[in-house]
Structures are given as C-alpha cells and as structure tokens.
Design a protein with these regions (language model features):
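FAD-binding subdomain of flavoenzyme oxidoreductases
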Residues: 117-271, 472, 488-493, 499-505
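N-terminal flexible segment immediately upstream of the FAD-binding catalytic core
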Residues: 1-79, 96-126, 155, 275-286, ...
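Activity-critical C-terminal alpha-helical subdomain
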Residues: 196, 445-505
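C-terminal substrate-recognition/cap domain of FAD-linked oxidoreductases
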Residues: 41-51, 231-235, 241-418, 425, ...
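A glycine- and small-aliphatic-rich helix-loop capping segment at beta-alpha/alpha-beta transitions
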Residues: 98-116, 144-148, 171-182, 229-235, ...
Length: 505
C-alpha cells in the first residue's frame, strides 16, 4: 500500500519568516514574467483579502496571489508552480463555507475571477458554456430571454461561481427535484497540475470511457483546475407556488418531510427552519413567517397550472395529517419570492444576532430529521451555545448555524466541539459529514469518523493519479492517518479512545 500523499514541502508550522521570504521571492521571480504586473500580488496589504473564504474562523495569508487573464497564463503559472513544487489553491468568489479555498502559507492562490464570461447560450440544445468565474445567478440571467434557467441555486448564487459549484458539487433549495451540480453539468475543461489541458465529459448527453466527470465534480480543487463548464438549462415552469406550513413542534415538521416524500410527492423545493431561525430572518426581511411556530416548512410546486393546483392540494393534505397548524399559500409570483426571501437570507440574518456563526453541513436520512433536531437541542445545553437550524429538508441536508463570539477562544473551542458532535451524530444516524459545502479543512477530522483507513487510502489513490506530488489544494478533504490518530486523542469518552487500532504519534 502506498503511503498517503505527504508533499515534501516546507511545513507552515516550522517555516521561519526568513525562509518564507526567500521562498516568496523565488516564486514571485518565477511568475512575474508569466502574468501582467497587476495580476501578481504578494504584499500583505494586497493579499489579505484572500486570507480566508466564507469560513472566516480560519485564516492564512497566501504566499502569492496570481490573477491570470488568459488560459495560456493559467497553464504557465501551473507549470512554474509544478516545477518549483509550490502548492496551488484555486479560488473562485471565496464564498465556500468549509475552508476549501483557505490559502497555503507557502503556496499560490490562483484566482479565477477574470474568467467571468459566458461563452454561449444554446437554446436548442438547452446548454450554456461558461467560464469558471461566472456567477451562478448570471447563467440564469443570460438564459432567461430564451425561457430557460440553470437549476442548482445555492443561497450564495448571486456571488458564488460555477467553478466553485463544480468543486463543491453544490445543490440549493431546488435540488430535490432538479438535482445537484453533478446532475446539471455535461462537461468540464481545464488544466492538470502540470499545466496540461484536460477535458471531462462532453457536450453530448453521454461521453465515452470512464465517468471521470463525476469524480472531478465535488473534488474540491484537488484533481484539476476548472476553467470552463458546459451546463444543462431547463425550461422555466409555467407556474410556481409556495406553501408556508407552520408546526407547533419541530419533530412534527421533520415527520412531515418524510411523509411528503413517502406519499410520492417530489416538491420543487422543500426547506425547513426552526423558531430561532424564523425569528432572525423575519426581523431581517419581513417575509411573512409565523413567529409563533416552532418550525416552518417552505414547500414549492411548479409545472402547469393544473399540475400545481393538484399538487398543492396533496401537499396541504399530507402536512395537515402530519400536524401542520397553519398554511399560507402564495397568491402570485411576488409573494412566492417573498416567502423564499427569508430562507435565502438565513445566513446574513444570523450575522445580525451573533458576532460570528459556524454553518455546519451534514446529511441524514429524511426519516431521522426529527431525531437530529432533538439531539441538536440537547447539544445546545451541553455546549452552552445557541443554534439556529435551517435545512434542505427534502434531501436531508442540514445547515445548523452555531452562534458564538470568535473573540472568545473558549466559545470558539466549544463551537468546534459542537460542530464535530453534530457531524458524528449525523454519521451515527446513517448520514454523512458533508452535503454540499465540502470537507475543506473544517471537516477533516470528522472524515476520520466516517471513513476507514482503507477507504481513505483509496481516496489518496485517486488523488495521486491526478496529482502525484500532492500540490493541488494540499491538506484538504482527506485526513492522513496521523490526523485521525490525533483526532482520536482529542475525543476520549469514558476512558475509551476511538480508533484504538490506530497508532498514536
């Protein structure tokens, strides 16, 4: 068995200021001839905006930031970094919530912000070819005159880029019916770590050979650098209507989700918020939410007017049977968007009631929603921190937002333990440690809970096939054996060590 990738690079923990300065000068000298002067940043005042992504609790100044403007420049930067054994972290809009774009102290942050052009919209084939830096929402805006749109819709769609969506396999509020990024992308084109062009998939509905496209989507920038994406477009529905359903008990709302799916109903959107989250967003956007409800469900139907009317009736009947106490049904498009505005602003609304928050991202079987909500309530007491809950309920994707003050080291520590507890509980209930935000650095230790050493070695094997020297986004996603052993040391429970079979270092 090959050892997991451990790049032979200067390690941040032992890097002296002088050694870092020498390395920086070497990298700047190598990259300066390859990109315009304004596209290479290394002074602290210029690189500080890149010191984190949406996970602001973790920060690291990059060695150098490169902002290439052409594909040839991207290839040249990658070739130079490969020659010098310099780590490369590709970056889109920096909206990721797991630290996937956290810089490497001795690496180059490769910003793809300049690759923001829509190459073509093809209404006949219902596809769009876009560069990696194009915003998610911009694709739908460009396709709108043709009566089409791009279905995956993360909450950050006004800012996040399609390249980042590919890296994380992003979903959104309508993924239950329309799928994740992997279900809506036909082709990805970019470069290998060596700067060689590579293409996965095709513009046809199927591509010959192994399905490497599915491996690249969701690989968090560890296998290749994406520059261009061909996405599927879908017709705008004739009509869409949303239901706000109130529940006097959070667990009843969880049971209602399972009941809807069990009844054979596939809503266009199915989202859930608990009372603390509802209060936060209602104060922020005035979406018309029931502030007395312990939880609300936003359930959407789309299609022809006849289909929507019939499905809305079925949805109401199922949720009423499950214990819903009140219903509000959108009367027009403006009211439907108003209902959704609260859900789409859940994160900024949380930022108004707490100095900081950490958004978790795990998945569980839908039938376990009620149980995980009860467990999270118990954890709030255990760790002495508040938590606002919002879920992509239809596919069991949880987004608990743990509220804390990052200026208080003890609160940050308790927040991290709280988050790890949520992830471990999700796995115990038959779920996973991540849904759509990725692993990044945030969930590295939790990967030790879900995957065995043999399974993690298979992941390293795939990484080695694409990136033998481990230079693309190193230290992310896949924990090493020693990392899992150290994680086991941190979580002694009743005198018993998890992962007792692993050597302790």
């Amino acid at each position: 068995m090959n050892a997991p990738i451990e790049p032979t690079l200067l390690q941040p923990a032992t890097t002296t200021r002088e050694a870092r300065a020498r390395r920086q000068a070497e990298v700047v000298a190598a990259l300066a001839p390859l990109v315009p002067a304004h596209a290479l940043l290394w002074q602290p005042e210029d690189t500080v905006p890149y010191d984190c992504d949406g996970l602001t609790a973790y920060r690291q100044m990059p060695l150098v930031v490169a902002l290439p403007e052409t594909e040839a420049q991207v290839a040249a930067v990658l070739k130079a970094c490969h020659r010098l054994a310099v780590p490369v972290v590709a970056r889109g809009a920096g909206t990721g919530l797991s630290g996937g774009a956290l810089p490497h102290e001795l690496g180059v942050t490769l910003s793809l912000a300049k690759f923001n052009h829509i190459v073509k919209i093809d209404p006949v084939s219902r596809t769009a070819v876009v560069q990696a830096g194009v915003r998610n929402a911009a694709i739908s805006e460009a396709a709108s005159p043709h009566g089409l749109y791009y279905a995956p819709d993360p909450s950050s769609k006004i800012a996040c880029t399609i390249g980042g969506n590919v890296a994380e396999n992003s979903g959104g509020m309508h993924c239950l019916k329309y799928g994740l990024t992997v279900h809506n992308v036909l082709r990805v084109r970019g470069f290998t770590v060596e700067g060689e062009p590579v293409e996965f998939g095709s513009e046809a509905l199927d591509a010959p050979g192994l399905d490497l496209l599915s491996a690249v989507i969701g690989s968090e920038g560890m296998l290749a650098v994406t520059l261009e994406v061909t996405v599927k477009l879908v017709p705008k529905p004739q009509l869409a209507r949303a239901i706000l359903a109130s529940f006097d008990d959070v667990q009843k709302a969880g049971h209602a989700v399972a009941a809807l799916i069990g009844a054979g109903i596939i809503p266009a959107g199915l989202e859930m918020m608990d009372k603390p989250m509802t209060a936060a967003v209602e104060d922020f956007v005035r979406a018309g939410y029931d502030l007395e409800a312990a939880a609300i469900l936003i359930c959407e139907s789309d299609g022809t007017p006849e289909e929507v009317e019939e499905e809305i009736g079925r949805m109401v009947a199922v949720m009423e049977q499950a214990g819903a106490t009140r219903f509000s049904i959108s009367r027009d498009e403006a009211e439907r968007l108003k209902f959704w505005s609260g859900r789409m602003n859940a994160f900024p609304a949380s930022g108004r009631i707490s100095p900081d928050y950490m958004c978790m991202d795990s998945t569980i079987p839908r039938k376990k929603l009620a149980e995980i909500l009860m467990r999270i309530g118990e954890m709030e007491i255990k760790y002495g921190l508040r938590c606002c809950n919002v879920f992509h309920a239809g596919d069991g994707n949880l987004h608990p937002l743990i509220l804390f003050d990052a200026n208080d080291p003890d609160q940050l520590h308790r927040c991290e333990l709280f988050g790890a507890d949520i992830l471990e509980t999700s796995v115990m209930l038959g779920g996973t440690v991540t849904g759509e935000h990725g692993v990044g650095v945030e969930k590295l230790s939790s990967m030790c809970v879900q995957f065995t050493p043999a399974e993690r070695e298979q992941m390293f094997g795939l990484k080695r096939a694409f990136d033998p020297r481990g230079l693309l986004n190193p230290g992310k996603v896949i924990p090493t054996l020693s990392r899992c052993a150290e994680y086991g040391k941190m979580h002694v429970k009743k005198g018993l060590l998890p992962f007792a079979h692993l050597p302790r270092f």
